[in-house]
């Protein structure tokens, strides 16, 4: 499913040999899968992704492209993003799978907020519609996975209270919502608090 990736990728190393946060990432992925906030559509196209910052570095681990529907991830399903260039629309990574198509968007959050340690990108049409333009929202003219989205994300940190609310609605990517926090626990909790505001499906 690499056709959904809109940036150029440079693989700089083979398989990831270790990722201490994999068990926790899988635990929160299972919760999101159970809630159908990530997964795969009827045609098998995956949606949703998670990432975790690599300690105090700028690098981050992210679920690989087209892995949304996989129940349990291994190291072969994750990539480690080690460099990016918004202007050149380029990502450098380690791993045996290409990083998620939203890697530049995740990178923009980590670059803009030094306290961010994890990012969740999910899909929920009802929540998306409920908080569109009420929560920090990207322009509906900006497509997902593009340098424009990365720049838009960085701008949200200067013109909105996104650093406090830690949630973003992607207006040009129907259903797309991002939350972030110091870790996956916080990013997931923020999403759940917002979800509780809408009536049960």
Q: What function would you assign to each model-found segment?
A:
Residues 1-201:
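Glycine-rich flexible loops
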């Amino acid at each position: 499913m690499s056709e959904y990736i809109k940036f150029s990728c440079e693989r700089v190393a083979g398989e990831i040999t270790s990722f201490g946060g994999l068990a926790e990432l899988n635990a929160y992925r299972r919760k999101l899968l159970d809630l159908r906030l990530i997964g795969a559509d009827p045609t098998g196209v995956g949606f949703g992704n998670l990432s975790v910052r690599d300690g105090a570095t700028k690098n981050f681990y992210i679920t690989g492209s087209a892995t949304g529907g996989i129940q349990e991830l291994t190291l072969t399903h994750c990539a480690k993003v080690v460099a990016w260039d918004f202007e050149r629309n380029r990502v450098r990574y380690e791993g045996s799978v290409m990083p998620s198509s939203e890697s530049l968007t995740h990178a923009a959050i980590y670059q803009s907020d030094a306290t961010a340690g994890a990012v969740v990108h999910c899909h929920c049409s009802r929540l998306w519609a409920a908080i569109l333009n009420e929560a920090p929202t990207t322009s509906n003219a900006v497509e997902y996975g593009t340098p424009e989205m990365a720049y838009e994300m960085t701008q949200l940190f200067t013109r909105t209270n996104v650093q406090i609310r830690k949630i973003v609605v992607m207006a040009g990517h129907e259903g797309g919502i991002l939350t972030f926090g110091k870790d996956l626990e916080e990013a997931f909790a923020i999403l759940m608090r917002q979800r509780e505001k809408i009536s049960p499906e």
